[in-house]
Amino acid sequence: ASFLRLHPCVAVITNIDADHMDTYDGNFNKLVETFLEFLHNLPFYGLAVLFIDDPVVQKLRTRLQKPSITYGFQKDADYRADDVSQTGLRTRFNAHRPQGESIQIDLALPGTHNVQNALAAVAICDKLGVAPNHIAKGLSSFEGIGRRFEILGRLPCQNGSVVMVDDYAHHPREVAVTLDAARACWPHQDLLVVFQPHRYSRTRDLFDDFVELLASETR
């Protein structure tokens, strides 16, 4: 696994899904063990930041022998998000910290997956001693990256216009959260999905999951 060549001081594990399984001989346990090896490569002063809502990550933590903190929506998370609300492309939530007052976060990004990612950033910044107001300001100014819910523009059509969104989501779980974000942005609009499979092996291994997900869409 190429990510074992990375040697960060802080490592965030957002989730562990069955992906790139050819690398792990089709063995999910081998994939999990590789993540554990990656975390054990952290220096003694390093930190693992773990999304506690993911059951695989939660189980992995019980075997981890490095300093770690957790984040998520669960009440026992060290850094917890609640009061999540989305209006259009913006998302607001409260980020609760182990010590001190919660931080009000206003993101220029839609979707609960971006809340999770922002909460991980809050946890890291807080551990590094960044002031809460600077954390909030920095996250509010972040507008995302290319091909991650990227608005390509509006196309005129017979009954008005169509918003075109490009997203690199290529795993069923990623596609699902992207579609959820789109529905939350435009709850009263039709959703038309154009999906391009990526990698033969991924499409083969996750074919049934892709079919189930995309078949649930009306168009």
Residue ranges and their predicted role:
Residues 120, 170, 174:
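Conserved cofactor-binding/catalytic machinery of classical short-chain dehydrogenase/reductase
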Residues 4-163, 188-189, 215:
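Acidic, Mg2+-coordinating active-site environments of NTP-dependent enzymes
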Residues 1, 163-170:
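Switch II (G3) loop of P-loop NTPases
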Residues 23-29, 169, 198-203:
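Short, flexible loop segments at the rims of nucleotide/cofactor-binding pockets, characterized by
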Residues 145, 173-175, 179-219:
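Active-site beta-alpha connecting loops in nucleotide-dependent enzymes
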Residues 107-109, 166, 195-197:
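Short glycine-centered, acidic/aromatic-flanked micro-motifs in structured strand/loop junctions
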